Amino acid sequence: MRKEFLLVVFLIGLLTKATIAQTQAKRIEKVYTNPLKVQLGDPFVLFAKGTYYMYGTGNPADRGFSAYSSKDLVNWKPEGQIYAYNNKNGWSDPNTPWDGAYWAPEVYEVKGRFYLFYSAQWKVNPAKEMENFKIGVAVSDNPTGPFVDLAPKPLFDPGYPIIDANVFFDSDGKSYLYYSRAAYKHPVESEIASHARKSGKYKEIEESWVYGVELKPDFSGVKGEPVLVLRPPVKLKDKQAAWESLSVTTGEVNRRWTEGSTTFKKGGIYYIMYSANHFGGEHYAVGYATSRSPLGPYKKADENPILHKNTDRGGIVSGTGHNSIVYSPNGKEMYCVYHGRTTTTGSERVVFIDRMKVENGKITVYGPTTKPQKMPAVSPNGK
């Protein structure tokens, strides 16, 4: 009898250990760690048909764009190439610098169809400009393509190179395109430029600026003239000058950037997040500005930058920027999706996803993180 009792106790013990081990395993499964296993720059995430789709700049696409899919925002499956330059309405030239500069794709679902906004080198280039970037729009019946350009030409030509398209759909039915005027051949005088000249760093400073313009409902063009929305600070005493000018003041390059914008609206306030400094350097970082109108004027936040490198604080992440925004599967949690680099990934841009919140008119991004984080919530109760 005693032996039988001991055997029962032993078996219960084994069962308890197994249950504990399974519980611990489940707990381990409910966390994730940055960076994700996706090598892309300028990541944009769309939620459609119950699935997340990620688009971005870089491999494995060949002169175009590829996509990834996920159910939980963490584990991503390659979906292959979704857009190629040589579709029947292709207007770009892959035989140009940066292999055609197929950059920063963003996809939006409108009335059951999917629209891809992107930038590339326009083949109409009589002046042989090195940076002849324009923005195009392609369409597909599926988020994974194939996408075909709406027309055999860019969306519009403002007369200067443009990149980093972002579209905001307002509650009144209007839609707006935000883009970055490339810094190429755009020297700008400022106190920062004057200081760089006097210190012997650079003779001139080129700048990229963010513009906004209303889109035609069918995305065949724009309505009215573009409006300047954001630019680097002019005065040295400006609160934003120090962090937005690091590419210049550290001797990295003679350019200042305002690019990679993403716009959303909450509580009647328009928020535009943007990236500053050289995308290839350690100082690439994210700030934001607010307005009561989609085309401004916008006021930059005093607490900028809200997402930047942590290598100066004992971390391993730098070059954080060009973000998009997405919500968890249960729609409750807000996430910032962005690219960065780590001391182990080197020069390759990899994708990060970190929680963010908007409270009392202020944006907070809880990143960059590289330690285990709780998985995005799936159920309504946050689990």
Residue spans for each PLM region:
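Carbohydrate-active catalytic/glycan-binding domains of CAZyme proteins
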Residues: 22-383
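Bacterial Sec-dependent N-terminal signal peptides
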Residues: 1-25
